[in-house]
């Protein structure tokens, strides 16, 4: 039997501050060694949990695990078959591949070791939580990389109302500023480690311009 706790919050905090909503969900964790922030409109394939435990039995050293994803629409039709990750992917290569459009990433496809997540400072916050998932995965996976679980996928729903799918002028402006903040944070992060950012200044500028346009 599964020990499941349902929690109804008195306010819709995620509407105004998604990171704050994630934080209070994380605060509910008790003795769980791992967690996944899974959305109520996305879908796990039936064998996802089974394949995670199989992966864990043989590859228990990692702090970040990952499911490959496909994108679905509101009718559960697959609209995009996303490229699969290498089974072991370094944190820097993760960033490089995302921002050169070779892989996709969404928060519900990642499983984190709870103790390590807390030790690394939890979520990296940007406006609208935009780019926060990428930054958070980078920090958590810096030491050991990301281990991808085979033979099971997460189906991430692009409903047309997700932040990443919203195109009104106000939201686009906030997303552009969040992207600039993220790239500034990224440069500072690698500078603090005496390492070179996986994205050049030219690449970061082009990506920012793309976000604005």
Question: In which residue ranges do the predicted regions lie?
Answer:
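Short beta-strand-to-loop acidic/aromatic patch adjacent to the donor-nucleotide binding site
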Residues: 32-41
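Glycine-rich, basic loop-to-helix element that forms the pyrophosphate-binding segment
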Residues: 10-30
């Amino acid at each position: 039997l599964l020990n499941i706790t349902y929690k109804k919050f008195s306010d819709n905090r995620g509407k105004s501050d998604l990171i704050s909503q994630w934080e209070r969900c994380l605060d509910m964790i008790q003795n769980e060694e791992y967690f996944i922030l899974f959305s109520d409109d996305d879908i796990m394939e039936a064998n996802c949990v089974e394949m995670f435990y199989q992966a864990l039995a043989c590859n228990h050293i990692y702090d970040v695990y990952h499911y490959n994803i496909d994108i679905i629409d509101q009718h559960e039709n697959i609209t995009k078959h996303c490229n699969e990750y290498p089974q072991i992917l370094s944190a820097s290569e993760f960033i490089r591949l995302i921002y050169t459009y070779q892989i996709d990433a969404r928060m519900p496809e990642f499983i984190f070791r709870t103790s390590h997540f807390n030790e690394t400072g939890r979520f990296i916050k940007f406006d609208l939580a935009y780019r926060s998932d990428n930054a958070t995965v980078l920090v958590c996976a810096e030491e050991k990389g990301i281990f991808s679980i085979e033979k099971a996928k997460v189906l991430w729903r692009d409903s047309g109302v997700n932040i990443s799918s919203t195109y009104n002028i106000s939201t686009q402006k906030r997303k552009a500023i969040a992207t600039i903040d993220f790239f500034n944070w990224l440069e500072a992060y690698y500078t603090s480690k005496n390492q070179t950012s996986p994205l050049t200044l030219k690449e970061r500028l082009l990506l920012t311009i793309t976000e604005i346009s």
